[in-house]
Protein backbone atom coordinates (compact mmCIF):
# COMPACT_ATOMS: atom_id res chain seq x y z
CA UNK A 1 0.00 0.00 0.00
CA UNK A 2 1.24 3.45 -0.91
CA UNK A 3 1.79 6.13 1.71
CA UNK A 4 -0.56 9.05 1.91
CA UNK A 5 -3.72 7.93 3.67
CA UNK A 6 -4.21 10.14 6.70
CA UNK A 7 -6.30 9.55 9.81
CA UNK A 8 -9.24 11.94 9.77
CA UNK A 9 -9.57 12.01 5.97
CA UNK A 10 -13.16 11.74 4.75
CA UNK A 11 -14.57 10.26 1.59
CA UNK A 12 -18.18 10.40 0.40
CA UNK A 13 -20.01 8.13 -1.98
CA UNK A 14 -23.53 8.72 -3.35
CA UNK A 15 -25.91 6.00 -4.51
CA UNK A 16 -29.51 6.25 -5.74
CA UNK A 17 -31.42 3.32 -4.23
CA UNK A 18 -33.01 1.28 -7.04
CA UNK A 19 -36.02 -1.01 -6.46
CA UNK A 20 -33.81 -4.12 -6.69
CA UNK A 21 -31.80 -3.09 -3.58
CA UNK A 22 -34.75 -3.50 -1.22
CA UNK A 23 -35.21 -6.17 1.45
CA UNK A 24 -37.30 -8.38 -0.83
CA UNK A 25 -34.37 -8.66 -3.24
CA UNK A 26 -31.67 -9.47 -0.71
CA UNK A 27 -32.66 -13.15 -0.75
CA UNK A 28 -35.35 -13.46 -3.42
CA UNK A 29 -35.65 -17.21 -2.74
CA UNK A 30 -36.80 -16.44 0.83
CA UNK A 31 -40.57 -16.32 1.30
CA UNK A 32 -39.95 -14.50 4.59
CA UNK A 33 -38.10 -11.66 2.89
CA UNK A 34 -40.92 -11.33 0.35
CA UNK A 35 -43.16 -10.15 3.19
CA UNK A 36 -40.99 -7.16 4.09
CA UNK A 37 -41.67 -3.60 2.90
CA UNK A 38 -39.92 -2.17 -0.16
CA UNK A 39 -37.12 -0.35 1.67
CA UNK A 40 -33.33 -0.32 1.34
CA UNK A 41 -32.03 -3.54 2.87
CA UNK A 42 -29.56 -3.53 5.74
CA UNK A 43 -27.37 -5.97 3.83
CA UNK A 44 -27.19 -3.63 0.86
CA UNK A 45 -26.49 -0.66 3.16
CA UNK A 46 -23.54 -2.57 4.65
CA UNK A 47 -22.27 -3.28 1.14
CA UNK A 48 -22.60 0.39 0.24
CA UNK A 49 -20.56 1.35 3.30
CA UNK A 50 -17.89 -1.14 2.24
CA UNK A 51 -17.95 0.25 -1.30
CA UNK A 52 -17.27 3.77 0.00
CA UNK A 53 -14.20 2.53 1.89
CA UNK A 54 -13.01 0.51 -1.12
CA UNK A 55 -13.22 3.60 -3.32
CA UNK A 56 -11.41 5.70 -0.73
CA UNK A 57 -8.56 3.17 -0.58
CA UNK A 58 -8.25 2.55 -4.34
CA UNK A 59 -5.72 5.32 -5.15
CA UNK A 60 -3.38 4.00 -2.45
CA UNK A 61 -3.26 0.36 -3.51
CA UNK A 62 -0.26 -0.99 -5.38
CA UNK A 63 -0.76 -3.13 -8.51
CA UNK A 64 -1.80 -6.62 -7.41
CA UNK A 65 -3.30 -5.41 -4.13
CA UNK A 66 -6.92 -5.30 -3.08
CA UNK A 67 -8.78 -5.06 0.20
CA UNK A 68 -11.24 -7.21 2.07
CA UNK A 69 -13.64 -6.36 4.85
CA UNK A 70 -12.63 -7.94 8.15
CA UNK A 71 -15.13 -6.39 10.58
CA UNK A 72 -18.32 -4.38 10.51
CA UNK A 73 -20.43 -3.04 13.36
CA UNK A 74 -23.27 -0.79 12.23
CA UNK A 75 -26.78 0.19 13.17
CA UNK A 76 -29.56 0.69 10.61
CA UNK A 77 -31.84 3.28 12.15
CA UNK A 78 -34.18 4.58 9.44
CA UNK A 79 -35.98 3.20 6.40
CA UNK A 80 -35.17 4.47 2.91
CA UNK A 81 -37.54 3.93 -0.03
CA UNK A 82 -36.24 3.43 -3.58
CA UNK A 83 -35.42 6.62 -5.45
CA UNK A 84 -33.67 8.44 -2.62
CA UNK A 85 -29.94 9.14 -2.76
CA UNK A 86 -27.93 7.64 0.07
CA UNK A 87 -24.66 9.38 0.85
CA UNK A 88 -22.08 7.36 2.75
CA UNK A 89 -19.32 9.20 4.56
CA UNK A 90 -16.25 7.16 5.47
CA UNK A 91 -13.71 8.71 7.83
CA UNK A 92 -10.37 6.98 8.34
CA UNK A 93 -9.88 6.28 12.07
CA UNK A 94 -6.62 4.34 12.05
CA UNK A 95 -4.00 2.66 9.90
CA UNK A 96 -2.12 -0.21 11.52
CA UNK A 97 0.12 -1.83 8.96
CA UNK A 98 -2.20 -3.35 6.37
CA UNK A 99 -5.35 -2.84 8.47
CA UNK A 100 -7.51 0.26 8.14
CA UNK A 101 -10.38 1.23 10.41
CA UNK A 102 -13.20 3.51 9.27
CA UNK A 103 -16.09 5.37 10.87
CA UNK A 104 -19.00 5.12 8.44
CA UNK A 105 -22.37 6.82 8.27
CA UNK A 106 -25.17 6.89 5.72
CA UNK A 107 -27.77 9.60 5.14
CA UNK A 108 -30.72 9.53 2.71
CA UNK A 109 -31.29 13.28 2.52
CA UNK A 110 -33.97 13.08 5.21
CA UNK A 111 -32.44 10.99 8.01
CA UNK A 112 -29.19 9.42 9.05
CA UNK A 113 -30.05 5.81 8.21
CA UNK A 114 -27.03 4.04 9.63
CA UNK A 115 -23.64 4.42 11.25
CA UNK A 116 -20.84 2.44 12.80
CA UNK A 117 -17.36 1.14 12.09
CA UNK A 118 -15.77 -0.92 9.36
CA UNK A 119 -12.32 -2.48 9.07
CA UNK A 120 -10.50 -3.55 5.94
CA UNK A 121 -7.25 -5.39 5.31
CA UNK A 122 -5.00 -4.82 2.31
CA UNK A 123 -4.26 -8.14 0.62
CA UNK A 124 -2.09 -9.48 -2.19
CA UNK A 125 -4.74 -10.69 -4.64
CA UNK A 126 -2.71 -13.51 -6.19
CA UNK A 127 -1.79 -14.99 -2.81
CA UNK A 128 -5.36 -14.66 -1.52
CA UNK A 129 -6.88 -16.20 -4.64
CA UNK A 130 -4.46 -19.13 -4.42
CA UNK A 131 -5.68 -19.86 -0.87
CA UNK A 132 -9.30 -19.66 -1.99
CA UNK A 133 -8.64 -22.09 -4.84
CA UNK A 134 -7.29 -24.58 -2.29
CA UNK A 135 -10.69 -24.56 -0.58
CA UNK A 136 -12.65 -25.35 -3.73
CA UNK A 137 -13.43 -29.00 -4.53
CA UNK A 138 -11.42 -28.81 -7.77
CA UNK A 139 -8.58 -27.30 -5.67
UniProtKB/Swiss-Prot annotation:
Binding site for substrate: 40-50, 69, 120
Enzyme Commission code: 3.1.2.29
Annotated consequence of substituting residue 42 to A: Reduced activity
Active site: 42, 50, 76
Outcome reported for the amino acid change (mutating residue 26 to A): Reduced activity
Residue positions binding CoA: 69, 76-77
One MF term in the entry's GO annotations: protein homodimerization activity
Keyword presence, Hydrolase: yes
Regions crossing the membrane: none
Reactions catalysed, as given in the entry: fluoroacetyl-CoA + H2O = fluoroacetate + CoA + H(+)
Enzyme class: hydrolase
Keywords: Hydrolase
Record's function text: Hydrolyzes fluoroacetyl-CoA before it can react with citrate synthase, and thus confers fluoroacetate resistance. Cannot use acetyl-CoA as substrate.
Subunit structure: Homodimer.
UniProt-recorded name of the protein: Fluoroacetyl-CoA thioesterase
Species of provenance: Streptantibioticus cattleyicolor
Amino acid sequence: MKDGMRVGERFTHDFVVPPHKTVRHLYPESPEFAEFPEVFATGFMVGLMEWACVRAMAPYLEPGEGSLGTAICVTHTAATPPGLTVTVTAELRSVEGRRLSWRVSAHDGVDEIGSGTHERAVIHLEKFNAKVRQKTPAG
